[in-house]
């Protein structure tokens, strides 16, 4: 089944501890930062929340690859009911992590332009961060019992995790099943193409803003345009990113077995992670934000701009060519 399913369990074990511990620590950190009215620490929490979500993306994908790695193996004492329950809680976790990341990024963008804290927005991030932390702990607790029958008790007993017919059918049920039916359910064949259209619109927004910002940093039209002028376009690109993350997760849930079997898929996700981190760099870089019309960016910032263009171009290339390159899936 290719590289990712075979290495999925190992990668998942390495990654999964980062969002679990990270969201707990960052939520507590943000609470005290708000109480002390410390803007510097609040910004640190916003950075952390966004980056933890970025890490959560390959964490969830490697978890799905792990499921396909163990689902049809008879040599492992794995309770599929627990696997599916774990997958459902993990999907809820990454949904709330995405909401936290969206608000955290907006808080950083707003702070860059206005220089103040975000009041109610901060408390909203704190509340969602607490929910995300709780869900992450639950997902981790369930996941830790999958390969350990000696600690399966109560709710975590496989017999109580999901109805037998779901486990036998290989259907995760719950929220995962809802998302699956949203894009593939019944005879509504228009749904997948409709979400594809949304995905293309989102990518157009992302790459359009990426080119405008990167070309300004590289030096195009620097005599007439300040960086602040293009900085205000970032929410448009971020809207495209939100659209693509939502539709992308629906595509993945709808056909995860095929996606994780595609050799080009890990390269797309790696490029996506890089692109999201570089996008954060352009959001919060004060040196770039201070550039006025006629001023040139530093050489290092220009290198970062090239990386930004290349990373999103890589995401687009592998996204389009996944079924055709390296033998498909």
Residue ranges and their predicted role:
Residues 1-329:
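Polytopic transmembrane helical bundles with strong interfacial aromatic enrichment
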């Amino acid at each position: 089944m290719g590289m990712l399913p075979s290495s999925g369990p190992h990668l998942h074990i390495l990654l999964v501890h980062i969002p679990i511990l990270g969201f707990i620590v960052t939520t507590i950190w943000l609470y005290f930062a708000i109480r002390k009215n410390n803007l510097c620490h609040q910004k640190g929490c916003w950075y952390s929340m966004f980056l933890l979500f970025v890490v959560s993306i390959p964490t969830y994908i490697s978890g799905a690859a792990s499921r396909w790695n163990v689902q049809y193996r008879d040599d492992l004492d794995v309770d599929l009911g627990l696997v599916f329950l774990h997958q459902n809680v993990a999907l809820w976790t990454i949904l709330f992590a995405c909401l936290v990341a969206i608000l955290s990024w907006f808080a950083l963008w707003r702070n860059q332009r206005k220089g103040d804290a975000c009041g109610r927005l901060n408390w909203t991030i704190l509340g969602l961060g607490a929910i995300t932390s709780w869900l992450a702990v639950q997902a981790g607790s369930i996941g830790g019992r999958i390969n350990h029958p000696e600690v399966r008790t109560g709710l975590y007993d496989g017999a109580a995790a999901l109805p037998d017919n779901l486990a036998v059918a290989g259907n995760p049920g719950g929220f995962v099943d809802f998302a699956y039916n949203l894009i593939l359910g019944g005879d509504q064949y228009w749904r997948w193409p409709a979400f594809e259209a949304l995905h293309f619109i989102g990518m157009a927004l992302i790459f359009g803003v990426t080119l405008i910002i990167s070309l300004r940093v590289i030096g195009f039209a620097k005599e007439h345009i300040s960086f602040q002028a293009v900085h205000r376009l970032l929410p448009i690109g971020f809207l495209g990113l939100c659209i693509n993350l939502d539709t992308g997760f629906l595509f993945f849930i709808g056909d995860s077995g095929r996606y994780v079997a595609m050799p080009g898929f890990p390269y797309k996700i790696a490029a996506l992670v890089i692109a999201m981190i570089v996008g954060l760099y352009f959001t919060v870089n004060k040196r770039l934000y201070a550039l006025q019309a006629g001023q040139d960016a530093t050489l290092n910032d220009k290198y970062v701009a090239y990386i930004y263009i290349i990373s999103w171009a890589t995401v687009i290339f592998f996204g389009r060519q996944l079924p055709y390159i390296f033998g498909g899936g």
